[in-house]
Amino acid sequence: MPELPEVEVTRRGIEPFVAGRRVERVDVRTAMLRWPVPAGLAEQLRAREVLAVERRGKYLLFEVDAGWFIVHLGMTGTLRVLPAAGVPVAAKHDHIDWIFDEFVLRFRDPRRFGAVLWHPREAGDVHAHPLLASLGVEPFSPAFTGALLHARTRGRTVSVKQALLAGDMVVGVGNIYASESLFRAGIRPTTAAGKVSLPRYERLADAVRATLADAIERGGSTLRDFVGSNGESGYFQLDCFVYDRAGQPCRVCGTPIRQIVQGQRSTYYCPTCQR
C-alpha cells in the first residue's frame, strides 16, 4: 500500500505539471472505486485551473477555484503523467483520466481500493472533510514531537508499533516505516506504548522524520505495484535495516533479524539493537 513517502513522491512528480494548468475534460471509466466517484465530477472540473496540489496524510488534495478533488491511492493505485500526444489506450485498470492541454493525468488501480472524491468550497475547508478531520499530525510539522507521542500514549498497553500505525497521533507511518523507525530509535516494537520514556520518544520522533525523508529521497518503496508519476519504481526497500530481512544479519551488529506478527502484519526487528 502506498504510504506517506510514496504519496509525497507522487505529489512532487505531479505538481509541476498540473499547478497553473486547466483541466480540459475528465474521462471517468469506472464509477465505483472504494466509494462511488461523484457523478458530477467531470462537469465540476471542466475548464478549472488547478491552483495547488497538497498532501494530507495519504490523501492528495487538488485545489481548484470551486473546491478540491481528493485522491487516495488505496492498496495498488498510481497516478501517472502521460504525454497527450500518443497517450496509450486506457487499459482495464485505468479508471480516470484528467486531460490537460499537453498531458494526461491517469489514475490506475487494479484492486479498486483507491478513491476519487469531491469537496465543494461552500462545504468549508477541505481539512474538515470527514476523512481528514481526525488524522494525526504531519510528521514533518513542528507539532510532531517526542513530547506529543509521550503524552498521547500514557496508560496505553497497545504496542508502540501498533500505536504508530493507528494514524491518530501521526499520519503516514505505515508498516515498513514503523519497523524502520523503531530500529533507528532502538525501541523493540512489542514494547507497550505507555512504557516508552520521553527521551526514547524524542529519539523515535527524530527517527520517524529521518526514515520518511530518506524514503522520499529514494522515491518511496516498491514492493509490488507502486511507481511514481513518471513510471519509475522506488528504491528505499533496498536500504531497509530490518523490514523483510528475517534471518539475515543486522546491518549494525550482525544478529539475525527476527520476524513476528502484530495485528495481522509482519514486524521485523533486531533483538540486540532494539530493547
UniProtKB/Swiss-Prot annotation:
Belongs to the FPG family. Keywords: DNA damage, DNA repair, DNA-binding, Glycosidase, Hydrolase, Lyase, Metal-binding, Multifunctional enzyme, Zinc, Zinc-finger. The keyword Hydrolase applies. SMART domains: Fapy_DNA_glyco (SM00898), H2TH (SM01232). One of its GO terms (molecular function) is class I DNA-(apurinic or apyrimidinic site) endonuclease activity. A zinc finger (FPG-type) spans 241-275. It catalyses: Hydrolysis of DNA containing ring-opened 7-methylguanine residues, releasing 2,6-diamino-4-hydroxy-5-(N-methyl)formamidopyrimidine; 2'-deoxyribonucleotide-(2'-deoxyribose 5'-phosphate)-2'-deoxyribonucleotide-DNA = a 3'-end 2'-deoxyribonucleotide-(2,3-dehydro-2,3-deoxyribose 5'-phosphate)-DNA + a 5'-end 5'-phospho-2'-deoxyribonucleoside-DNA + H(+). Monomer. It comes from the Bacteria. GO terms for biological process: base-excision repair. This is Formamidopyrimidine-DNA glycosylase. Pfam families: Fapy_DNA_glyco (PF01149), H2TH (PF06831), zf-FPG_IleRS (PF06827). The lineage of its organism: Bacteria, Pseudomonadati, Pseudomonadota, Betaproteobacteria, Burkholderiales. The active site is at 2 (schiff-base intermediate with dna), 3 (proton donor), 58 (proton donor), 265 (proton donor). DNA binds at residues 93, 111, 156.
